[in-house]
């Protein structure tokens, strides 16, 4: 009896005070005998058991009782499977034929927003379930959208997610704020034992609006002390009950425009890489290549390096070693090693990445990959179309943080930065000057909330919504001396390659942006510009409908 009491108290301690997720596996839930002929309403107890509450003739009856009863642990069960829950997360599957799961804008699945893979982290907030189709509305990595229940809906094969009621979760992915930093803790599978935490990364310096402690968030901007409150807000489409509802967090490294310059030089980069790698690494001694690419193509060297470290495992992955490919370029999830692009040299890879993939695509308004000029998340930024990892932007930001910490944070908050304060369409155009015309006949505009700019000056201009302040900012696209940006044919065929003009700026109305830092740093317009050789012509520079370059799941 004493042994049983000890075990009981030990298990209670685990459930209440550990950073883990416990639940019945999908197989265990499915093998449970059905308690009702059609629909069962059950209570999901914290020990992983399901206790019948009542039987119903249809889903709608059970749903109504579930939503109007005080019991927060209620779930709807059919044929031994949980098909809905009052408050729950989902565990999305990592084993699909494509290697990822699409997220769609609406239940009709007519428009793909982005894509995710459970190979990295597999829990998301469950907002809504459509019983008839099995499709569900979720939030993960900042994006809200719908996913399918089955990879093949016609045959109902390959289930893409399981519903995990929050009574079975004690700590899914969560953020830890310390006295000096913010850390993201990941679990790769919500059913793993408590000692199987996948990874933890420091993504930035301590957010000023958050006290030390543990928090939940599926966007990295608004944080919650408990999952129930988070889910209530998500279901209501707001952040009213988050701990920072009036002051969202924008991690400097995730929301720094690529059209910026680092304060570090080639020697600094080589010093850092010398401390983190060996001479066998493909990143070893690449400082000059990164700085030259920054100066010529207008892309922050440390942001590029951070992506390279994340994608190549510090230059030691098989793709980087055999193909000189530091950035996972074309390493699609289904066949990363086979599909990844080969380069003649590491410097060729760095130059192609800056010129073709960043300046030519991800930073080019009008390209289907353009969602803003920063790392961002699955809602906004490069992360939307670059990678299937919902937290790819945070992981790249982690390496920028590591580099910056190594040298005493000389880049952190250097610039005055701001983010677009809402979604806009055909509203926020970049101007040649506050009183002038839009930049380019192609109408370069900012659309997605969170799109980042660096503010180089504040000037007065025409009043917009009662505000006469305009921001002078660096341009997302590469523009020419006439403030036009290039068509694909001109951009890719010109020799030597077209360089970014650091002395050309654009202007945007301040009323549409929220300032997040006040660093006041300036752009060096007199950088040494070294024309870089053209490795190989781009055989198909125009955007294709295929998925964007996708990093390999883990460094090989």
Predicted regions and their residues:
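Sec-dependent N-terminal signal peptides of Gram-positive bacterial secreted proteins and lipoproteins
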Residues: 1-23
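Surface-exposed, glycine- and small/polar-enriched segments that build interaction surfaces at terminal
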Residues: 455-457
């Amino acid at each position: 009896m004493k042994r049983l009491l000890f075990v009981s108290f030990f298990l209670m301690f685990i459930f209440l005070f550990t950073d883990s997720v416990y639940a019945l596996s999908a197989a265990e839930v499915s093998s449970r005998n059905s308690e009702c002929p059609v629909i069962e309403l059950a209570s999901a107890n914290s020990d992983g058991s399901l206790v019948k509450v009542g039987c119903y003739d249809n889903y709608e009856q059970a749903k109504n009782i579930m939503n109007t009863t005080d019991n927060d642990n209620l779930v709807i069960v059919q044929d031994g499977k949980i098909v809905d829950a009052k408050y729950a997360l989902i565990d999305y599957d990592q084993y699909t034929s494509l290697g990822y799961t699409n997220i769609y804008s609406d239940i009709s699945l007519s428009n793909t927003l982005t894509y995710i893979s459970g190979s990295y982290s597999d829990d998301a907030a469950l907002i809504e379930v459509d019983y008839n189709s099995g499709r569900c509305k979720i939030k993960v990595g900042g994006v809200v959208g719908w996913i399918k229940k089955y990879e093949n809906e016609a045959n109902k094969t390959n289930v893409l997610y399981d519903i995990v009621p929050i009574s079975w979760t004690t700590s899914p992915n969560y953020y830890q704020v310390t006295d000096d930093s913010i850390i993201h803790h990941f679990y790769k599978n919500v059913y793993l034992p408590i000692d199987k935490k996948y990874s933890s990364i420091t993504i930035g310096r301590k957010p000023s609006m958050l006290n030390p402690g543990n928090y939940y968030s599926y966007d990295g901007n608004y944080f919650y002390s408990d999952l129930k409150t988070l889910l209530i807000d998500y279901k209501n489409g707001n952040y009213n009950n988050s701990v920072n509802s009036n002051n969202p967090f924008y991690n400097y490294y995730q929301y720094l425009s690529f059209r910026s310059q680092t304060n570090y030089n080639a020697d600094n980069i080589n010093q850092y890489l010398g401390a983190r790698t060996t001479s066998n690494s493909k990143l070893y001694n690449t400082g000059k290549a990164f700085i030259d690419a920054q100066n010529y193509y207008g892309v922050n060297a440390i942001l590029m390096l951070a992506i390279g470290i994340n994608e190549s495992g510090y230059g030691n992955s098989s793709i980087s070693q055999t193909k000189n490919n530091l950035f996972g370029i074309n390493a699609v999830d289904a066949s990363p090693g086979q599909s990844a692009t080969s380069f003649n040299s590491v410097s060729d890879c760095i130059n192609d990445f800056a010129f073709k993939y960043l300046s030519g695509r991800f930073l080019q308004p009008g390209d289907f990959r353009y969602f803003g000029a920063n790392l961002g998340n699955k809602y906004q930024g490069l992360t939307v179309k670059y990678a299937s990892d919902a937290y790819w932007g945070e992981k790249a930001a982690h390496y920028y943080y590591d580099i910056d910490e190594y040298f005493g944070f000389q880049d952190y908050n250097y610039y005055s930065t701001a983010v677009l304060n809402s979604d806009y369409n055909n509203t926020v155009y970049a101007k040649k000057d506050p009183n002038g015309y839009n930049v380019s006949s192609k109408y370069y505009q900012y659309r997605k909330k969170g799109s980042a700019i660096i503010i180089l000056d504040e000037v007065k201009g025409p009043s917009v919504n009662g505000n006469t302040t305009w921001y002078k900012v660096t341009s997302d696209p590469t523009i020419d001396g006439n403030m036009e940006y290039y068509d694909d044919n001109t951009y890719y065929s010109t020799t030597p390659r077209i360089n970014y003009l650091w002395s050309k700026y654009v202007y945007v109305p301040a009323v549409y942006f929220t300032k997040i830092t006040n660093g006041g740093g300036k752009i060096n317009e007199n950088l040494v510009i070294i024309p870089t050789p053209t490795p190989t012509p781009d055989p198909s520079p125009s955007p294709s409908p295929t998925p964007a370059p996708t990093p390999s799941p883990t460094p090989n």
